[in-house]
Amino acid sequence: MYLPSLVLGLLGFGLTASTSPIEERSNRSKAPAGCLTVGSSGTYATIGAALSALGSSTSDACIFIGAGTYQEQITIDYKGKLTMYGETTDTSSYKQNLVTITHSISSPEAGSLDKSATVNVRSDGFKMYNINVINGYGKGAQAVTLVANADKLGFYGCSFVGYQDTLYAKAGRQYYSNCYIEGAVDYIFGDASAWFGECDLVSVGPGYITAMSRTTADETTWYAIDHCNIYGKPGVDLTSAVYLGRPWRVLARVIFQNSQLSNIINPKGWSPMATGATPLYYEYNNKGAGADTSKREYESPISGAVSIATVLGGGWNSWVDTTY
């Protein structure tokens, strides 16, 4: 169901799906050329309807979503490369996003983690710009906001809000830039190789930021949190109540580097989870009240920052939007 915004009547929309060029950072109040359009003045009233209209094509495509709140649960399994744009007054950040996709269901109610997700991405090469995604279930059970289960995914200026298991970085290579990620318990988890650059990771309750599930030594997967801000939601006292992570599987591998760690981080830094785990947990060049490593547990030494090529592999700049 679509809940219109007052500004939608001012917008103009295109009609067809095709490739569109990377935009410069600016106001995005109308559809990039060639995009299918969603909203009160668009061709489609719901995001799901626009996705259905893409059909079985394998051509590159894009969808523009006009300002408003969309009460939907969507699966993105398009066979071509799809880009989804949200209306915003500032494309360089999540802070002025005008589009929200929201749904509320827990994993036990839905039957699985994937089925609880507000947005479930299964399409290789998918990109999302300036869209807020929420699972409003709250405390009490796992309830996923985003399942990212494909290769070469990019999320730019997006916001992901949940409580337990917000962002399921499940598999493939993934890039998150200037995003907002909110939760309390294991709110970034899975076995993707994921780079989080210049993101805000915001805890709303005691718990664990990451729960990485690398299982075998030959897996090349990492979570790299680089130049990010880690803090608690204003008004919630979480002093020393949050851990950087715990290993969902035995060989979890995570680095926090070049980031600001607030006083929410417990001096121990990391916590146990999987039986017999020997995780690889690294910290490098972080600042702030939570960055003191003198009392850390489970931390491994490292001599320098991890590169994006290490995390995402060679050729990463052929699919990452390096202008963002």
Swiss-Prot record:
Chain ranges passing through the membrane: none
Record keyword Secreted present: yes
Binding site for substrate: 142, 246, 248
Entry GO terms, CC: extracellular region
Catalytic activity entry: [(1->4)-alpha-D-galacturonosyl methyl ester](n) + n H2O = [(1->4)-alpha-D-galacturonosyl](n) + n methanol + n H(+)
Pathway: Glycan metabolism; pectin degradation; 2-dehydro-3-deoxy-D-gluconate from pectin: step 1/5
Signal peptide: 1-19
Compartment(s) where it occurs, according to its Swiss-Prot or TrEMBL record: Secreted
Top-rank taxon, per record: Eukaryota
EC code: 3.1.1.11
Active site as annotated: 165, 186
Positions annotated as glycosylated: 27
Top-level EC class: hydrolase
Residues at the site labelled Transition state stabilizer: 164
Record key words, sorted: Aspartyl esterase, Cell wall biogenesis/degradation, Glycoprotein, Hydrolase, Secreted, Signal
Cross-referenced Pfam families: Pectinesterase (PF01095)
Family designation: Belongs to the pectinesterase family.
Protein known as: Probable pectinesterase A
Taxonomic path: Eukaryota, Fungi, Dikarya, Ascomycota, Pezizomycotina
Gene: pmeA
